[in-house]
Amino acid sequence: MIEGAQAGRLPVTVLSGFLGAGKTTLLNAILRNRQGLRVAVIVNDMSEVNLDAESVQRDVSLHRGRDELIEMSNGCICCTLRADLLEQISDLARQQRFDYLLIESTGISEPMPVAETFAFLDTEGFSLSELARLDTLVTVVDGSQFQALLESTDTVARADTEAHTSTRHLADLLIEQVEYANVILVNKRDLIDEPGYQAVHAILAGLNPSARIMPMAHGNVALSSLLDTHLFDLPSLAASPGWMRKMEATDTPASESDTYGVTSWVYRERAPFHPQRLLEFLQKPWHNGRLLRSKGYFWLASRHLEIGLLAQSGKQFQWDYVGRWWNFIEPSQWPRDEYRLQGIMAKWDSVVGDCRQELVFIGQGLDTRVLQRELDHCLLSAQEIAAGPLAWQALPAATAFDTEALSARPTPPMAVQPT
């Protein structure tokens, strides 16, 4: 018997992955080999006709008395249907008829918002975690296409209807699906030779060092790897991306590389970036190995009060602003709890406070010395720093980083060139 069901909370596994990765094949395989478990399934598809749900229904047609299929169409689990998802899971959990719940997410959603649904408190203080236990986040990737898709310039519709734009880059979606997973299944292993599989494995491990990465073909994978694993933990998941783990690590070298040449490197400096020189860096063709992922915080001279968040996946750099540096906030407005205060002071500098450049780069064949020189060139010179914030506002290309350009595609686009 599944432990969560015995304890009164319905255990849940969420299946994510891009369209065609093999989520439905995996779901069908689980339902065919569920070892007598009474399973409820929530399927989400963006189309009018939910073909994925129909295929699952055929597989469980002999067990309709014990299995329940719920279709959630015309929306996305991670955003527009969050309220519906809460209601559906709550209803299933209260029935106490099922041992397990499987959720197949749409191909254009990422796992983290689904996970946050379980921690969400409604207006009456109710949390879904009182009735259901999120057990495992599983991401399925097409091993035969994953590297090519990372290089794609294609865009997909955004699941997040409140975002700045209605589309996002495919590479960005794929990486987020990988970064926020407990288990990553490399599907179509039978179509990949051993060096190809190891190369994909190395990339995935660089993007998410804490995930369990396993090969899969035709949905065949041990049920114990997906159900009742107890791998999910929200704080740990939030810190699972490789870029974040590298940024927070204090006992590892600035640059690390494994046998397949996947390097993670952190750029740290305490001077602001010049907007024009930074923009030139972001727009120029990339010739320094193969850049897989970069993300982190930046300090821009023309917006010196604000914390910049720079993110790259595939061939696209994007930026946003996520609040003010604590250096420009009155101490009376600082957090009171010791844990958060320690976090602020851990990044504190006696001259510029917490203002900083802290960018993580993950890639293959990266020459970090070249990257260091290029980024150093983007910093303000001593003379420019001495001119002060008023002069910084008038620096060339300052408007390129205004709010209107938060999701703008740099022109010409960044060109990631594989080694």
UniProtKB/Swiss-Prot annotation:
Keywords per UniProt: ATP-binding, Chaperone, Hydrolase, Nucleotide-binding
InterPro entries (alphabetical): CobW-likC_sf, CobW-like_C, CobW/HypB/UreG_nucleotide-bd, P-loop_NTPase, Zn_Chap_cDPG_Synth
EC number(s) on file: 3.6.5.-
Reactions performed catalytically: GTP + H2O = GDP + phosphate + H(+)
EC top class named in words: hydrolase
Motif CXCC motif: positions: 76-79
GO molecular function: ATP binding; hydrolase activity
UniProt cross-references to Pfam families, sorted A to Z: cobW, CobW_C
Binding site for GTP: 17-24, 79-83, 187-190
PANTHER family per the UniProt record, alphabetical: COBW DOMAIN-CONTAINING PROTEIN DDB_G0274527, ZINC-REGULATED GTPASE METALLOPROTEIN ACTIVATOR 1
Function in brief: Zinc chaperone that directly transfers zinc cofactor to target proteins, thereby activating them. Zinc is transferred from the CXCC motif in the GTPase domain to the zinc binding site in target proteins in a process requiring GTP hydrolysis.
Annotated protein name in UniProt: Zinc chaperone P47K
